[in-house]
Amino acid sequence: MSKVLMVVAQKNFRDEELFIPKEMLQTEGHDVKIASLARAKATGMLGASVMPDMAVHEANPDFFDAIIIVGGSGSPVLAESEDVLGLVQNANARNKIVAAICLGPMALARAGVLAGKKATIFKTEESLKVLKQGGAKYTGEDVTVDGRFVTACGPHAANDFGRKLIEMLKEQH
């Protein structure tokens, strides 16, 4: 089955946006790894914690079929990380599935991979500005797919986001 990398902020990732798609992907037999900016415990907004399998700078996109940026109030930090932006750009250059949920699409926009693409995001003044600066066309949908890119607007869309990722991984193989 496919290998998937989920990237979370060290602090204040959105719990459901990690655990719901992760569980769905694993149930389908996909190998899911977690990365964060450091190999140290990451904590969610609702109190869950996870020990990342690797730091983002250790992640090689060649080993993964999909890269997912998890949202939450801490996720804008990921959009400021050269390691995260480089990972997204490298995954895109290798024609991988690139996905993000909630505020996670800010990292995709800052990496320059959403130019000319339709996308959705957790709507704030700042997030819409970053999407626009990245050349994305905001849809306002719960989940938006444009080619290999999947974006979702927040925790209530985590199930649909997971289902869409599973569909796309099946099509890839």
Across the structure, where does each feature detected by a protein language model lie?
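Extended, subdomain-level signal for the structured scaffold at the beginning of enzyme domains
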Residues: 1-94, 98, 107-113, 128-173
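Catalytic nucleophile serine of serine hydrolases
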Residues: 102
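Short Cys/His-rich Zn2+-coordinating modules
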Residues: 116
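Acidic, metal/cofactor-coordinating or nucleic-acid-engaging core segments within structured domains
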Residues: 119
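Glycine/proline-rich loop-helix segments at beta-alpha junctions forming the active-site rim
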Residues: 122-124
